[in-house]
Amino acid sequence: MNNRALLLTDGFLATPNAKTAHGLIRGSERYTVVGVLDKPTAGQDAGVVLDGHNRGIPIVASVSEALSQLAPLQYAIVAIATNGGVLPASMLNDIKECIEHGLSIVNGLHEFLNDKPDIVTLAQQYGVELIDVRRPKPRNELHFWTGEVNQITAPI
């Protein structure tokens, strides 16, 4: 798998607020998680912090440390779940630094990175993607009820 990813947890790794990270640490078919950026738990293994099982996923204290130890990286994933889905302002510098080093950002929060002009401009400048997974598709791409399911025959 080539989708090598760094999880950004902003100090929440050892809390329930990092449930996105917890799931990805346990396993992912889409991404190869190669590290976690979490200053309070830096130097430990992410699996050990999560549930006591070593998974060979190092925790680092900075983006520069991640880049020097874990390269190549393709993605940084905002791997926390906050009250209201708000992006903590404290994460913005790490996100910007990741973008400046060519990492696309995957964001599962309800606050969209694509709504932040400075982040969008930076991503365009460095040729990376901002993937807001919770952003709904445009209305013209949505599928509406057609009744087609009623044509399916199935044994009872």
Task: Write out the residue ranges for each language-model feature.
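ADP-ribose/adenylate-binding Rossmann-like module
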Residues: E97-N114
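Walker A (P-loop) phosphate-binding motif
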Residues: N140-I156
